[in-house]
Amino acid sequence: METSNRKLDHLRITLLEDVEAGDTWLDFVKVPHRAVPELNLEEVVTEIEVFGKKLSAPLIVTGMTGGNEHAAKINAVIAEVVEELGLGMGVGSQRAAVERPELEWTFRIARERAPNALLIANLGAPQLLKGYGLEEIKKAIDMIDADAIAIHLNAAQESFQPEGDVDYKGLLNKLSELVDKVEKPIIIKETGAGLDYESVKALRELGIKAFDVSGSGGTSWVRVEMYRAREKGDEVLATVADWMSSWGIPTAASIMEARAAAPDALVIASGGIRDGLHAVKSLALGADLVGVALPALKAAYEGKEELKKFLKSMMLSIKIGLFLTGSPAPEHIKGKAIVLGPLKEWALERGIYEEWLRAR
């Protein structure tokens, strides 16, 4: 199937169907309340700098869409709002536009509507193993004048696509050839199944300095592919996708894994971040930045004001969360999370708990 048509399928399904599965485990994260915060709420600072761009809060809309007219309209709405609020955004995979230049405008519109915002380009890891190199990466970056590029990992999703790219052999070698040659920072981004300690450590050793965990508990791209398989009459593939739709590392655990493996890296918490409390807990776990996708996509589909209301609510939640923990700025809330139940058991069984304590 042509890439742009597949992306249209994905957009339609994520907007209309129940595509969430798994559990973020953020319910097993507690952040102690500071009864005497010794702060003035109005003086709490939420601004941070990421890739040379100042953000008014540690919050971005992570990439989900592009490559067709409907996606372009959504990207335009998101771009206008993040520009107005001083936030950032990523676009969905740009493969379709790299291969068909007439689709570039569906992504470029993001920079046109957000001339000053942090923008993150996006290409898939499997394409790097099928011939993509510096030329295609540069094309994706230049297309939206991006400040960074996400290389997304989606082995789980690809496993359930009849046309899926399931050869990941040699990816580390390929990335090692590119990491020092790409002009902009590279973000390694999962897509709903979470980043693990071993992968992050290996990637950090290559020189990668930014990771978007995109853990389980939010949008399940396996579940999205389940709907596509049903529509095509492939009941075997649909059944297996249904069984495995909750596959992945819960977002809270993935934040801990990434932070333990790469104490000095930028860690973006995403995957099932649905409200401001989730954002505060993610920052307390050790994330530098919080990413939202599906709720922002659905709000943008309703219109600019709906998205603005959602993002402003997230921003205010973060500010109040910092205040209530005695944290004058985002970096001060790191290390204040207490992890309980299966999340702590996971960290102990995985042998990352002590490293996480030191790194957060």
Curated annotation (Swiss-Prot):
Molecular-function annotations in GO: FMN binding; isopentenyl-diphosphate delta-isomerase activity; magnesium ion binding; NADPH binding; oxidoreductase activity
GO aspect biological process, one term: isoprenoid biosynthetic process
Entry EC no(s): 5.3.3.2
Amino acids binding substrate: R6, K7, S93, Q94, R95, Q157
Positions contributing to FMN binding: T62, G63, M64, T65, S93, N122, K189, S214, T219, G272, I273, R274, A293, L294
Binding site for Mg(2+): E158
Keyword annotations of the record: Cytoplasm, Flavoprotein, FMN, Isomerase, Isoprene biosynthesis, Magnesium, Metal-binding, NADP
Highest taxon above the source species: Archaea
Catalytic reaction list: isopentenyl diphosphate = dimethylallyl diphosphate
Listed transmembrane segments: none
Known function: Involved in the biosynthesis of isoprenoids. Catalyzes the 1,3-allylic rearrangement of the homoallylic substrate isopentenyl (IPP) to its allylic isomer, dimethylallyl diphosphate (DMAPP).
PANTHER family per UniProt: ISOPENTENYL-DIPHOSPHATE DELTA-ISOMERASE
Protein's name according to its UniProt entry: Isopentenyl-diphosphate delta-isomerase
